[in-house]
Amino acid sequence: MESATSLISEKQCECAHPNSDSAVQGSSLRWSIAAIESLLDLPFSDLIFQAQTVHRQYHDANAVQLSTLISVKTGGCSEDCAYCPQAARYHTGVENQAILSREEVVAAATQAKESGATRFCMGAAWRGPKQRDIEYMTEVISAVKALGMETCATLGILKPGQATQLKQAGLDYYNHNLDTAPEFYGEIITTREYQDRLDTLEEVRGANINVCCGGIVGLGESRMARAGLIAQLANLDPYPESVPINYLVQVEGTPLYGTPELDPFEFVRTIAAARITMPKAMVRLSAGRRQMPEAIQALCFLAGANSIFYGDKLLTTGNPDTEKDLALFEKLGLHAL
């Protein structure tokens, strides 16, 4: 069997039927890039019908989890991710901020819970945590966990043993996105290798932490590259329990500012492909919702998205306010998990 953290090629595997046992088990490579391209090429209504059918087999079709994301350390990152306003080398207006205190994080988590969120995510802008950062994070994770919330952290590249410390503190999920397909990755990031990301996912799995791993669409990638991203995710063994799909938020000062915007229906197609290929996962409608019409968000839910980030800010970019989200839920007959 291939390693769960080896890169796949287009001809390595063929598509399993989405309703078959082999499509659910994470025991072997299941989805080729060509097979996922075939999904993305389907007539829109056929693709959405297939995704909704799979979604209803494994999830409450009208339930959406509310997650809140906070930046515990903002700005000054040494990486060169072309989409990120927190990279120190870009002039985006994002100022470096001192790491939040434990009390500030707990206060934010408490407010999120009172607003209806059940999941609290903490992100930090650095290449990877030092030991003192891990010690800080274990304190805040334990404190947030004590509130009865599901916890997630996105802290960059992990060294051996760090994931175990986070697990012992009560961390439920670790987020480390692949961002895009390996073939397109070098166009977006040069300061870390694709394999670095896969190695961190291996550390997370080894510590028995749930994996939160997805990507960004609208980076200027081709449809084949979007299929390649979904193939990489779906063929992890097992595939991630949580799959955030982000629509690029263009920030002035980053290299990707001014990139032609992706057709939003292509974003919906990507959500549908994620749902079909990873039927048990939470598919998270993540960054970019503020620029989406309500009708497009509704189509994303129909395509199998069952989580949103809730609150007026995602790290450093805007997000729909909570009242708008609750009003949309009422229109669509959705309820919070």
UniProtKB/Swiss-Prot annotation:
It catalyses: (4R,5S)-dethiobiotin + (sulfur carrier)-SH + 2 reduced [2Fe-2S]-[ferredoxin] + 2 S-adenosyl-L-methionine = (sulfur carrier)-H + biotin + 2 5'-deoxyadenosine + 2 L-methionine + 2 oxidized [2Fe-2S]-[ferredoxin]. Residues 62-289 form the Radical SAM core domain. GO terms for molecular function: 2 iron, 2 sulfur cluster binding; 4 iron, 4 sulfur cluster binding; biotin synthase activity; iron ion binding. One of its GO terms (biological process) is biotin biosynthetic process. PROSITE patterns: RADICAL_SAM. Its EC number is 2.8.1.6. Keywords: 2Fe-2S, 4Fe-4S, Biotin biosynthesis, Iron, Iron-sulfur, Metal-binding, S-adenosyl-L-methionine, Transferase. Binds 1 [4Fe-4S] cluster. The cluster is coordinated with 3 cysteines and an exchangeable S-adenosyl-L-methionine. HAMAP family: BioB. This is Biotin synthase.
